[in-house]
Amino acid sequence: MRFSGSPSPGPSNSSRWWPLDAGDANTSGDLAGLGEDGGPQADTRNEELAKLEIAVLAVIFVVAVLGNSSVLLALHRTPRKTSRMHLFIRHLSLADLAVAFFQVLPQLGWDITYRFRGPDGLCRVVKHMQVFAMFASAYMLVVMTADRYIAVCHPLKTLQQPARRSRLMIAAAWVLSFVLSTPQYFVFSMVEVSNVTKTYDCWANFIHPWGLPAYVTWMTGSVFVAPVVILGTCYGFICYHIWRKVRGKTAGRQGGPAEGAGESALYRGVLHARCVSSVKTISRAKIRTVKMTFVIVTAYIVCWAPFFIIQMWSAWDKNFSWVESENPATAIPALLASLNSCCNPWIYMFFSGHLLQDCAQSFPCCQNVKRTFTREGSDSMSRRQTSFTNNRSPTNSMGTWKDSPKSSKSIKFIPVST
């Protein structure tokens, strides 16, 4: 990398979306001047490592595009009412597709051609969009977790124009991601990386010696550290709130019902049976979405942590040797950061089984899967209705309720509106 104000170019370019690239230490040779025969040194690289990088990026791109496109297709075709969680899943899938097309795909082409092939303006746009996709994926995860925090810890606020608030949060994540990634236009440009071979590449320029560490630290903090802190705080409050609710319900059961309640207690219990069941169902749905979001956050941290550790190490350690970056053990973890965009779609489908069913409906070859899901769903619904009719719903099965020895003919059952 070449630092502005430094006497000579550094050893590495920045073909990755960051100013540092663990896989491009092989460019140090073309900056050394003349070869052993006195002629210009060839512009070469570690071809074995380059092939490995190309293969990994190609697999990540294909899997990310297929997975996230399937989720978007399933959300579009689902006959169910769209929820706020579906809205966040849709935009997180769009952010993951942005990672695939704006970050992984340009890097794949760049690794194939070795040097950036394009004008200075295209160099700046590509670098901007690569970092924009990183910001969008991270910040969309933050707003989705914030929505789960509001739904669990402040449920009354969900009644106050929840759709409008969710759309504002999503729009803020997109706009903030675009704004925070604009410095890439001023950091990167087409630079002559060899005075001998007259080779140009898309490189970053920094003020020596503090520019590079400051930039990498800022990007690490804004893309990784700050989101992880916010996510951890939200989940801390969510877990504490759920723990308090569980403890309160346990204490209530231990107290038991008051004696002498008589027919009025039975009457109230009958009237509110469906309401209590609905509340329990909503609570289970919230907990399921909280679990799904937690798994997504964990996958984000696991995939991105090695990348940021390598970047911070290479920026702050003065003894860092660029020869070490030619080791696949150092280069591949930096590439696997984008693997997070491949994991998210399967997490959605695991926690929302109907998404897989709705996606299967779009492909004729998956009609057997569709019929299996439909048959299992019908059997499950039939079992639930039978159990509810025989045991819990006197308003739907008068005969069963009258046969009970504990029933009272003086009780009048009023239909409960749902």
Curated annotation (Swiss-Prot):
Keyword terms of this UniProt record: Cell membrane, Disulfide bond, G-protein coupled receptor, Glycoprotein, Lipoprotein, Membrane, Palmitate, Phosphoprotein, Receptor, Transducer, Transmembrane, Transmembrane helix
GO cellular component, one term: plasma membrane
Topology within the bilayer: Multi-pass membrane protein
Biased composition (Low complexity): 1-15
Taxonomy, superkingdom: Eukaryota
Residue ranges that the UniProt entry lists as topological domain Extracellular: 1-51, 110-124, 190-217, 314-331
Family: Belongs to the G-protein coupled receptor 1 family. Vasopressin/oxytocin receptor subfamily.
Name of the protein: Vasopressin V1a receptor
Organism: Ovis aries (Sheep)
Lineage of the species this protein comes from: Eukaryota, Metazoa, Chordata, Craniata, Vertebrata
